[in-house]
């Protein structure tokens, strides 16, 4: 399979402040809940942040924001590195942007004027959706990225309602009006169908970051309420499919490292913060910081009890997640509209016989032929465009469906079996 060659480098150009932690201090693994109350778990997490340097990756600004909230001296060079990363429109800039938005919305009174002005310019200048100007290789279309981009656009528009965002020409109010339906549709599909990136020990972290930022800062009460419901449902997924702090079930999307070593799971810190088991790793987490700093979301106590209900002899959890492409109409989806196309791409249905014509149109509409993720399609642009003009793309896709749709995630049925001593999990067609 083609692997995009992306630059996720996060260079920090200034030294840390005096007395900044030099080396990581490992957290102790807790096989049993180490504190029954969230306030105590939150305090332990914040103390762990203060003892440790930020990770050397693009999640670093979240940890420095937590350090600031905990009364420590943050590494301001990391905040400026975050702004550089966003300005360069590197892949996952939307992750970093959510740290900047929370920083501005929750801690602006603790930032100097120069950093505030630079952050404002970065937010106003960002490319919030693939139909806006500029060539880049940001992934905007997977399930987690869609809510990250749409929620960031809405919150940015809310912050600067009368400002013009120069990359699109939209005012902030325009941004809110454009992205509100996208947020609502995403929330509706998660509530009705669950996640295409089901039970992901990587991407649930990203989903939570966007959703908790909406809950905390969005002034639209309906969006806040619906986002909180989806967070509850997502955390129910985690509670039902985890074992002693490890989100060790079947995953719709994950990576080798996170499968081999639970401490590298993006959800590791969130598990220990919310459920009391596991380990604070500070390696690749955003949502733990957002949940620890949230002033408006508190997880229902019953989810803590479910996650820690390991005394019964056995527990079986069966779930259905996602949609079937042959039932697209059931979910209000067609095969002409680019907005529907974004829903299909959240399933990674690029070259499916039912979606390939629409996907080819999206490559044109969004100038995606040069996007690093779509290099294999760009190399065959002439062939694909010709086949599309002749109406042959669906036929070609059908002939090679087994090979070219292997990443597509349609409806899945998961089965998790948990006992006091072990947990097994599988995904079934």
Language-model features: locations:
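Extended hydrophobic/Leu-rich segments
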Residues: 1-12, 34, 38, 45, ...
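Low-complexity, Ser/Thr/Pro/Gly-enriched N-terminal "stalk/linker" regions
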Residues: 2-77
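Short low-complexity stretches enriched in small and charged residues
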Residues: 16-20, 111-114, 165-170, 372-383
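Non-membrane alpha-helical secondary structure
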Residues: 34, 38, 92, 111, ...
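Aromatic-lined, polymer-binding surfaces characteristic
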Residues: 43-218
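Exposed alpha-helical structural elements
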Residues: 99, 114, 118, 182, ...
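A compositional/structural signature marking long, glycine- and acidic/polar-rich segments
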Residues: 162-280
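Extended polysaccharide-engagement surfaces of secreted carbohydrate-active enzymes
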Residues: 225-429
């Amino acid at each position: 399979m083609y692997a995009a060659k992306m630059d996720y480098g996060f260079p920090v150009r200034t030294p840390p402040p005096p007395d900044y932690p030099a080396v990581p201090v490992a957290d102790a693994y807790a096989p049993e809940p180490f504190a029954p109350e969230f306030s105590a778990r939150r305090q332990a997490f914040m103390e762990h942040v203060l003892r440790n340097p930020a990770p050397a990756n693009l999640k670093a600004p979240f940890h420095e924001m937590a350090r600031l909230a905990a009364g420590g001296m943050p590494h301001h060079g990391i905040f400026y590195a975050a702004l550089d990363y966003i300005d360069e429109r590197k892949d996952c800039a939307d992750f970093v942007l959510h740290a900047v938005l929370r920083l501005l919305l929750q801690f602006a009174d603790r930032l100097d004027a120069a950093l505030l002005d630079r952050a404002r310019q970065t937010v106003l200048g960002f490319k919030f959706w693939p139909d806006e100007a500029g060539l880049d290789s940001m992934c905007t279309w997977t399930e987690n990225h869609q809510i990250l981009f749409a929620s960031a656009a809405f919150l940015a528009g809310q912050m600067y309602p009368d400002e013009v965002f120069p990359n699109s020409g939209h005012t902030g109010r325009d941004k809110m009006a454009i992205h509100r339906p996208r947020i609502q549709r995403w929330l509706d599909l998660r509530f009705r169908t669950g996640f295409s990136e089901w039970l992901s020990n990587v991407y649930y972290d990203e989903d939570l970051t966007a959703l908790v930022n909406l809950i905390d800062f969005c002034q639209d009460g309906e969006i806040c309420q619906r986002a909180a419901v989806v967070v509850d449902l997502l955390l129910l997924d985690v509670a039902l499919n985890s074992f002693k702090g490890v989100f060790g079930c079947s995953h719709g999307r994950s990576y080798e490292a996170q499968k081999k070593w639970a401490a590298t799971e993006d959800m590791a810190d969130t598990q220990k913060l919310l459920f009391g088991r596991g380990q604070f790793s500070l390696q690749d987490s955003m949502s733990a910081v957002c949940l620890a700093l949230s002033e408006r979301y508190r997880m229902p106590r019953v989810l803590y009890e479910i996650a820690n209900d390991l005394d019964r002899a056995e527990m079986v959890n069966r779930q259905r997640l996602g949609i079937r492409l042959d039932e697209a109409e059931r979910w209000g989806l067609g095969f002409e509209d680019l907005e529907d196309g974004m829903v299909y791409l959240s399933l990674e249905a690029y070259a499916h016989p039912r979606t390939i014509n629409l996907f080819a149109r999206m490559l044109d509409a969004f100038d995606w032929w040069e996007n690093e993720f779509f290099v294999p399609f760009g190399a065959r642009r002439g062939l694909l465009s010709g086949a599309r003009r002749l109406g042959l793309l669906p036929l070609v896709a059908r002939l090679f469906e087994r090979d070219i749709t292997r990443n597509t995630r349609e409806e899945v049925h998961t089965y998790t079996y948990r006992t006091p001593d072990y947990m097994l999990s599988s995904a079934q067609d």
